[in-house]
Amino acid sequence: MNNLSYLEPDYSEFVEVDPTGRYGRYNEVLGKGASKTVYRAFDEYEGIEVAWNQVKLYDFLQSPEDLERLYCEIHLLKTLKHKNIMKFYTSWVDTANRNINFVTELFTSGTLRQYRLRHKRVNIRAMKHWCRQILRGLHYLHSHDPPVIHRDLKCDNIFVNGNQGEVKIGDLGLAAILRKSHAAHCVGTPEFMAPEVYEEAYNELVDIYSFGMCILEMVTFDYPYSECTHPAQIYKKVMSGKKPDALYKVKDPEVKCFIEKCLATVSLRVSARELLDDPFLRIDDGEFDLRSVDMEDSVGPLYRQPHHLPDYYNYPSNSSSLNRQYSNGNYPSNSSSLNRQYSNGYNSHHEYQNGWAYNPAETEETHGIELFESRNNDDQEEEKKSGNVDITIKGKRRDDGGLFLRLRIADKEGRVRNIYFPFDIETDTALSVATEMVAELDMDDHGVTKIANMIDGEISSLVPSWRPGPEFEECLAAAAAANAASICNNCVSNRTSMGSVMDFLRTNPGANVIQCCRNGCGETHGRFEEITIRETEVRLRELWKLQQQQESRELSSIDSGHNHSEEEEEEEVLYEDPENMFSCEAGNEINHISGSGSFSFMPSKYCDEPSEKTENQVQQELRWLKAKCQIELRDIQDEQLKTRWPESGEEVEISPKDGFLGSVSGLGREEDTVKEMFGERLVPKCLKRTTSLPVDAIDS
């Protein structure tokens, strides 16, 4: 049975031997790449088959000195001994033929990519087992001093002994011992190369990036950036921070999060040791993780592993018809030889439908977790969740050509979220901004697609040349910021790359679309500034502002000796209600009682008539707010009593007049009058912010 009859007569004789005479190479090619050819070879001392790897240097090296240096580096690699590193028996440089030859162990199941393609149905537990073995091998390489970096890690360079589930890192012939002079070379496969490799300044963490791409390849069966047709396109995407499209096919949140952790920027990327301690890879011996890793099939259904799978439904791990002694080479494709009698006494009756193994148990209720998105189910869920909220969006063009948008989300309970954010039409897409917004502001109840479509529609109205459409090239840009604590700075945000709401309001005083601080207290989340208010709080604040304006007009009339015009008395104040835009005239809204701090309501034709109970509550709250402002003003006034006049230098004592302490907003509006009386240093500019008291002050 086990004989060498499959070898042709020409392969029975050595065509080349190593300098020691121990290893002989046959003319049988097991695999071939761009610069390397793998032959079957034999170890005469041990009597085992090995793999003879031959690398053509061509113009890689320009002098004999370079060859000698490379020989010394590769020779050190045979000292690496680890159970998850391919055994490296010997290596030498053939200077005459400009070849590098190295002999390694032979594997029964080929590369991890070939093995994964043959076995499409793999439980996620098995994938975690492979990941742990690969990480142990990387940790061993990186623990050397100086570290050894692989520089070309991919599933084609990871090998499997399928009968034992053993995974080993191979193809170390192109690896280098990390030194300053040796690490500065751009080597590897473009799809698996980290951004810092293109910059030719990197360390051992480039292998972690490649490892993340290997997991993505194991899950999706595709090379990363398979959507690109040219290496230049891959380079552009990698350097701009765009992740491969295949990443967005992964639905399992744990798998996706683990991959993103490996693909993080070099400053945030973790080591192999830290990844081994990651909760994702922790599975106790008695624990069962029943999620299956399936490949998305465009022609057939996606079957999931049932919760209870009898032993006789499991495929054998090893089959002599499939696992022939091939390594590093081409493998026969799947055949119908699986449908035969196995040694365990059970018949396999699985039939193939569209390339998938069919199992009767899989037609029943399943409990697996799919790794790929089901767009129809997601859309239905989003529509169900978004039915309880009203989402609108408005935008405005800035002087520099940029856009500033406000997203307004109102629910049935009267809670309103106003989210202000900039939008760069050159670099941003509606989908990327919507995805970032949902992650930053924890907006799980609102669909990303719906928000993206609304952003597209508003931008199209502001920029006629805008071309809307979803693009899945962008991913979450601030994952670390999403976990950071949200700190409220009383609506004064930190400066972002696109500016802030406060900067926009200062530079655009006449903006009607953007209304912010008077309605609530804001929080900054990355580029987004959020102000959350309630409908009753909006009404309360507007009434308080109207009373302040009435008192300030009376004060100004007494201090300046002239009356305001009839137009100023009838000045309108606009504010936004959750349902409509209300216009309440100050003269009709407030009937001020001279000499008292109370007021009465006179409903206008645009405002709802409040009940007696609501009116009493509003009066009580306004009296509390007024008293608080008066206390603050008295404290500031006491500190300024001994301030000198700028011109004469004489000490001035300020005597507050009746009603002077009644309005914070009045001081802001009558700033010129106060300057004439007391000088610029007496103007309490900081008091302007009390017109936007925090929401918490009203509830206390």
Swiss-Prot record:
SMART domains named among the record's database cross-references: S_TKc
Stored InterPro entries: Kinase-like_dom_sf, Prot_kinase_dom, Ser/Thr_kinase_AS, WNK_Ser-Thr_kinase
GO molecular function per UniProt: ATP binding; protein kinase activity; protein serine kinase activity; protein serine/threonine kinase activity
Active site: 171 (proton acceptor)
Protein name: Serine/threonine-protein kinase WNK1
Residue ranges, compositional bias (Basic and acidic residues): 551-565
Compositional bias segments (type: Acidic residues): 566-575
EC number: 2.7.11.1
Stated family: Belongs to the protein kinase superfamily. Ser/Thr protein kinase family. WNK subfamily.
Role: Regulates flowering time by modulating the photoperiod pathway. Phosphorylates APRR3.
Annotated Low complexity bias: 314-339
CDD domains: STKc_WNK
One Pfam assignment: Pkinase
Protein species of origin: Arabidopsis thaliana
Start and end residues of each stretch annotated as Disordered: 314-345, 551-575, 647-666
Superkingdom to which the source organism belongs: Eukaryota
Phenotype caused by lack of the gene: Plants display delayed flowering and altered expression of genes involved in the photoperiod flowering pathway, such as ELF4, TOC1, CO and FT.
Residues annotated for ATP binding in this entry: 104-107, 154
Upregulating conditions: Expressed with a circadian rhythm showing a peak in the evening.
Gene: WNK1
